[in-house]
Amino acid sequence: MVLQMIKDMNLNLKVMQGVYIEAEMNNFGCPWGKVYSENELKNNRHQNLVKVKKLIKLANSYPDVIFSLSAGNEATVDWTDHYVSPEKVIEYVKLLKEGTRQPVTFCENYVPWHHKLEALANELDFLSIHTYPVWEYKHINEALEYTKQNYYGVANKYPGKPVMITEAGWATNANGKGIDPGNVSEDFQERYYHELHKWCEKENILTFFFEAFDEPWKGSPDANEPEKHWGVFYENRAPKRVMKPYF
């Protein structure tokens, strides 16, 4: 287990540990999601609770490694294929806060924080947003400014809450479905990475860059599917351009 290895080897690493909560409701607004039977949804609700309880155990077993907890990931945004109501997420958040000492968050696209997650935000210790300018057809030249708009839009709405970026990145390949192939490359990824890092360091914004390694299992069978190409390393662990200076 990764957490045990970090502890045993005394590695200078901290982890945000989260649960991936599955669909508890059908989201007919998701263009790629399936329609779940009531039995499937019932089972998902049960398994989600099991996952939350397991997270509580992990948090208490590795208090020096796990620095924060997330009650889910992209489960309330309009296009999600694993929809869970904000009210149910609040229940999971309360369970985590009652059973652990670590601060609790929920990782979500920046949009829902503006219009449907106010009650959830009040329960969280800090907010976590995802921002992907390239998915919203922004050119690399306007990418950082768009990220700033996404961030400050949420931060200014909740002035009493710390806000971190738990996903931000730039793909290195695309097939034209959702992302213009001319707007992705290792050069563009490198530029966005460094511009984002410089800004976040200046503003003291904790950020997770998405992501470490390519995930070829994601998305469609098309080898150029953009979901497969967000890593700063290839699947075989070879560094892409942005990481080559460090290896």
List each language-model region with its residue ranges.
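Loop/turn elements at helix/coil->beta-strand transitions in domains of secreted/extracellular proteins
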Residues: 10-14, 63-68, 99-104, 122-125, ...
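Active-site clefts of carbohydrate-active enzymes
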Residues: 77, 81, 129-135, 157-189, ...
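Aromatic-rich peripheral "rim/lid" segments of glycoside hydrolase catalytic domains that contact
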Residues: 181-188, 199-247
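Charged helix-capping and loop-helix junction motifs
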Residues: 52, 85-90, 142-149, 189
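Substrate-binding cleft of extracellular glycoside hydrolase catalytic domains
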Residues: 2-102
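Alpha-helical scaffolding within the catalytic cores
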Residues: 1-2, 50-57, 107-119, 148-152
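Aromatic- and acid-rich polysaccharide-binding/catalytic face
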Residues: 13, 17-19, 23, 28, ...
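Aromatic-lined carbohydrate-recognition surfaces of secreted/lumenal glycan-active proteins
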Residues: 19, 71-73, 93-114, 160-171, ...
